[in-house]
Amino acid sequence: MNFQRMTDLNLAGKRVLIREDLNVPVKNGVITSDARLRAALPTIKAALEKGAAVMVFSHLGRPVEGEPKPEQSLAPVAAYLTEALGQEVKLFTDYLNGVEVEAGQVVLLENVRFNPGEKKNNPELAQKYAALCDVFVMDAFGTAHRAEASTEGVARFAPVAAAGPLLAAELDALGRAMQTPEKPMVAIVAGSKVSTKLDVLNSLSGICDQLIVGGGIANTFLAAAGYNVGKSLYEADLVETAKQIAAKVSVPLPTDVVVADASQINFEDFLGSLAAAQAVIKKVEDVTANDMILDVGPETAKAFANILTTSKTILWNGPVGVFEVDQFGEGTKALSLAVAQSDAFSIAGGGDTLAAIDKYNVADQIGYISTGGGAFLEFVEGKTLPAVAVLLERA
């Protein structure tokens, strides 16, 4: 992909406006997870080292536009950046008509979603953002699938528009996996419903050599192959769709599964009741009417791990079982370790996938972990991300 990169630009004395994703959880004024802030720091530091006058902006939460509320202010983020950067980072609440900032200094602009017109990508608001800077840097991959004034609109009007290091790294990794994958390529796509991952499955079926499915998605594929899935979560209306996908790409199905008796499961306390439920390993053809499939069995986990070991590119989206409960997490654990130990280039994305990576402590052995969530899925679906498309146009 051809786009301008912040790292290639001369920023000395330039006013640089950086769109980061600083949407962190805040409870009683305290940031409870700083992962996104830590991810943004290298970009901010790099701009400072290049001699830029740096303005950073982001959204936080889902405020009503034009109705700022203290609990949705970026004030805790300004305090965090002040400490992390070793310089006072002032928070500007009134910035649309200009901001005073010197070279080597960082300021934070208040929550963009306080500004009327932000979500609807109002061109007048986008032009006001653009007027603040000499260079606009888009570095928030997690919001790249949204055409908003601070992500897409500003990039149209800024004198120069470039990708920050975080965004560039995401696009490079996704491009490597989706556009120029080294073969054989294997994708793991798991989740509760085929319907929510249908575009992902269709897109990957045209790229992958093998498509490993898990969770409720695997149950729908098992039903399509004529197996009884008992009381397992599956989508009867998408059985034909599963057959069509399986006709396009190799979809290795589980040969054994881990089940629980559905009568032992309380859906109002799903994980709690699963923790007390008995896990039973069964051949897939032995699943009975009252069984609920909650993980792949050890034989299947080993077979899937062997597929991953011999692949050159792995894209992973979703755990293959209810890994939050240990007796239904062995399949996800085995696949996590197989991805980690494989020599393949691996990219992983999606909230549950990241939680599994954390649980099994394999983050350092995954080639690239996408922070994008919805943007990651839309890229994998083959959709154009508005904030990326404008950077390609401006290149």
Curated annotation (Swiss-Prot):
Q: What does the UniProt keyword field contain?
A: ATP-binding, Cytoplasm, Glycolysis, Kinase, Nucleotide-binding, Transferase
- InterPro entries per record: Phosphoglycerate_kinase (IPR001576), Phosphoglycerate_kinase_CS (IPR015911), Phosphoglycerate_kinase_N (IPR015824), Phosphoglycerate_kinase_sf (IPR036043)
Pathway field of the UniProt record reads: Carbohydrate degradation; glycolysis; pyruvate from D-glyceraldehyde 3-phosphate: step 2/5
Recorded GO cellular component terms are: cytosol
GO BP field = gluconeogenesis; glycolytic process
Looking up Gene3D superfamilies in the UniProt record yields: Phosphoglycerate kinase, N-terminal domain (3.40.50.1260)
Primary place of residence? cytoplasm
Catalyzed chemical reaction(s)? (2R)-3-phosphoglycerate + ATP = (2R)-3-phospho-glyceroyl phosphate + ADP
The entry sums up its family as follows: Belongs to the phosphoglycerate kinase family.
- Check the record and name the PANTHER family matching this protein: PHOSPHOGLYCERATE KINASE, PHOSPHOGLYCERATE KINASE 1, CHLOROPLASTIC-RELATED
Subunit comment: Monomer.
Provide the protein name.
Phosphoglycerate kinase
Gene source species: Acinetobacter baumannii (strain ACICU)
The primary gene name is pgk
